[in-house]
């Protein structure tokens, strides 16, 4: 028999009754039932109940073991009594009567429990992550992550992609965040950078004559803490394709990612045909470029109903600003004054003056609009709004006014809030879509200049002719995002593979040819030697896994994450370098203000 085990703790069944077996694992818990000791023994695979009676030579050792001790058990498989069968456990029909127990490793008193879902401070959980990972939910999340990545690899291979690895030590590149820099000992005073994404390398792979590339790529970004991102590093399914247009990438990757979701959706419906929603339409309908389409609320412009109306606040806004609009946010079943007042209070908490509303209710046989807005604009306009928004008895609508560019994010938040408060969101499905036609440029109000709105390497729609035109802020990019349940899970674009178009795009944001050649030298040089039209995307693995397992945050699907202050409490990183290490790297640490 093997030194430690003949079976795992999830393997034995009623058909094994009478067998002599050996198991090893962690003591999940110990229970004393009238002299009999019951030990739940746990390993990576599952749980088996061990029984030690006072007549067994194993009993003396069994009395000493405590939670999370590691033990080896030799014993005989016996059937449980019918009244003690645990139908929720794969091994629930049997138990092991112990003949011998060996303690392989004792454990100190635990700083946090490893069963159940303990509400412990996150810093304690991260410091003792090796204990936290023993919890069933977290353990299963990590295993699911591995299976999801394996499924991605399989499906990418099935549609003709080849996996390549790209360098981790590379040159600094402005991807939109700060780089993590690595000093070079051999070349003092110079630095490598950890890649924010394999963007330039994957394009170079296409220029090198390969056709369909992918990898599970680690990405490193020195960003300020954000609730929806892991500090430091994250992983993405990165891919690129040669000789493709936008539709080719979308038509290739939609079935791949839909298939991944269907495999791990645990029976929840998954969108079969993804909508392709232009960015401008998404912002107008949903107030977001990553809309949760499980929420049925769609906003509409209702400016005409308030123009020259008795509600002077909105009427004056429309009269004094040609850019101004009034948007209506329909809220089915929201037709109570209490709910409308709650939404108004929420808006004030968000820094807004309030949130105008109308709600409709039956007065006898007549459907009437109620609330201050309805009184001010009159019955005819109120009825026209109701009909446009498709509302009925017991429904409500909320209104925002001004320049849409200034209120759109608040309007989107109000849509989300109303959908959640009214339980309009179907949480038992995965709703996926594409967002397309992103703006290529945006106006930087602080610096009073044009900037790239998203990925600077994307091809502008209309090419160099559009860049030479006058309506620069009207140019759209061949860029697209995949969105699921309100989360951006993938982003990509058709690349700007023409050197002169690339230079012109960067000149528009203030970077001259010399700067482009210096900062993107490898890519720019490669484009001089025959670059195929190409495009691709990257899907965020951490977010995909989080959605599929139903985790509340990204740390629940990551094995060893940092905390929100970008500190690794388990390994105590970052840490100070020794004087010798600094000398070898020709570095000196400048004193901070507190040290000065």
Swiss-Prot record:
Its main location: cytoplasm. GO terms for biological process: aspartyl-tRNA aminoacylation. It comes from the Bacteria. It is found in: Cytoplasm. Keywords: Aminoacyl-tRNA synthetase, ATP-binding, Cytoplasm, Ligase, Nucleotide-binding, Protein biosynthesis. Disulfide bonds: none annotated. PROSITE patterns: AA_TRNA_LIGASE_II. It holds the Pfam family tRNA-synt_2. Its EC number is 6.1.1.23. One of its GO terms (molecular function) is ATP binding. It catalyses: tRNA(Asx) + L-aspartate + ATP = L-aspartyl-tRNA(Asx) + AMP + diphosphate. ATP binds at residues 221-223, 488, 540-543. One of its GO terms (cellular component) is cytoplasm. Residues 199-202 are annotated as: Aspartate. InterPro entries: Aa-tRNA-synt_II, aa-tRNA-synth_II, aa-tRNA-synth_II/BPL/LPL, Asp-tRNA-ligase_1, Asp-tRNA-ligase_1_N, Asp/Asn-tRNA-synth_IIb, AspRS_core, GAD-like_sf. The record marks 33 as: Important for tRNA non-discrimination. L-aspartate binds at residues 175, 221, 454, 495. PANTHER family: ASPARTATE--TRNA LIGASE, MITOCHONDRIAL, ASPARTYL/LYSYL-TRNA SYNTHETASE. Homodimer. Aspartyl-tRNA synthetase with relaxed tRNA specificity since it is able to aspartylate not only its cognate tRNA(Asp) but also tRNA(Asn). Reaction proceeds in two steps: L-aspartate is first activated by ATP to form Asp-AMP and then transferred to the acceptor end of tRNA(Asp/Asn). Belongs to the class-II aminoacyl-tRNA synthetase family. Type 1 subfamily. This is Aspartate--tRNA(Asp/Asn) ligase. The gene is aspS.
């Amino acid at each position: 028999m093997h030194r430690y085990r003949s079976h795992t703790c999830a393997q034995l069944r009623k058909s094994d009754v009478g067998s002599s077996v050996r198991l090893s694992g962690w003591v999940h818990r110990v229970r004393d039932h009238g002299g009999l000791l019951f030990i739940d023994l746990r390993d990576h695979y599952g749980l088996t109940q061990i029984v030690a009676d006072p007549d067994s030579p194993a009993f003396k050792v069994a009395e000493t073991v405590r939670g999370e001790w590691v033990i080896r058990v030799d014993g005989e498989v016996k059937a449980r009594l019918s009244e003690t069968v645990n139908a929720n456990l794969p091994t629930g029909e049997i138990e092991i009567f112990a003949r011998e127990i060996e303690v392989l490793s004792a454990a100190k008193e635990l700083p946090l429990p490893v069963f159940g879902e303990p509400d412990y401070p996150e810093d304690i959980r991260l410091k003792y992550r090796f204990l936290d990972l023993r919890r069933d939910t977290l353990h299963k999340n990590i295993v699911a992550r591995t299976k999801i990545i394996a499924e991605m690899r399989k499906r990418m291979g099935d549609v003709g992609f080849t996996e390549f690895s790209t360098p981790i030590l590379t040159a600094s590149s402005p991807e939109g965040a700060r780089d993590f820099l690595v000093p070079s000992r051999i070349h003092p005073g110079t630095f490598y950078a950890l890649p924010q994404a394999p963007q330039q390398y994957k394009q170079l792979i296409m220029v090198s004559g390969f056709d369909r590339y992918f990898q599970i790529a680690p990405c490193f970004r020195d960003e300020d803490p954000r609730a929806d991102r892991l500090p430091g590093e994250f992983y993405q399914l990165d891919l690129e394709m040669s000789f493709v247009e936008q539709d080719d990438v979308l038509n290739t990757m939609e079935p791949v990612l839909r298939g991944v979701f269907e495999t791990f959706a645990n029976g929840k419906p998954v969108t079969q045909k993804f909508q392709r929603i232009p960015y401008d339409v998404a912002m107008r309908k949903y107030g977001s470029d990553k809309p949760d389409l499980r929420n049925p609320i769609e906003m509409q412009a209702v400016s005409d109903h308030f123009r020259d109306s008795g509600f002077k606040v909105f009427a004056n806004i429309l009269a004094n600003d040609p850019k101004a609009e009034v948007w209506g946010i329909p809220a089915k079943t929201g037709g109570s004054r209490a709910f409308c007042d709650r939404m108004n209070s929420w808006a004030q908490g968000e820094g807004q003056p309030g949130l105008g509303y109308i709600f409709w209710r039956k007065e006898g046989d007549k459907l009437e609009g109620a609330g201050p807005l309805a009184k001010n604009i009159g019955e005819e306009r109120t009825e026209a709004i109701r009909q446009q928004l498709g509302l009925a008895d017991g429904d409500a609508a909320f209104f925002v006014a001004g320049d849409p560019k200034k209120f759109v994010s608040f309007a989107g938040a109000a849509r989300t809030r109303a959908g959640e408060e009214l339980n309009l969101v179907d949480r038992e499905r995965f709703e996926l879509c594409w967002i397309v036609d992103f703006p290529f440029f945006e106006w930087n109000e602080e610096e009073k200049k044009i900037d790239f709105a998203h990925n600077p390497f994307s091809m502008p729609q209309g090419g160099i002719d559009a860049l030479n035109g006058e309506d620069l802020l009207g140019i759209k990019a061949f860029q697209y995002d995949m969105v699921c349940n309100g989360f951006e899970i993938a982003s990509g674009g058709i690349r700007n593979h023409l050197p002169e178009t690339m230079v012109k795009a960067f000149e528009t944001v203030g970077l001259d040819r010399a700067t482009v050649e210096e900062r993107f030298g490898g890519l720019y040089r490669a484009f001089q030697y025959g670059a195929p039209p190409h495009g691709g995307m990257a899907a965020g693995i951490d977010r995909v896994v989080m959605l599929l397992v139903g985790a509340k945050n990204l740390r629940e699907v990551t094995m060893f994450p940092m905390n929100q202050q970008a500190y690794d409490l388990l390994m105590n990183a970052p840490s100070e370098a020794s004087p010798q290490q600094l000398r070898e790297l020709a570095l000196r640490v400048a004193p901070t203000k507190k040290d000065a």
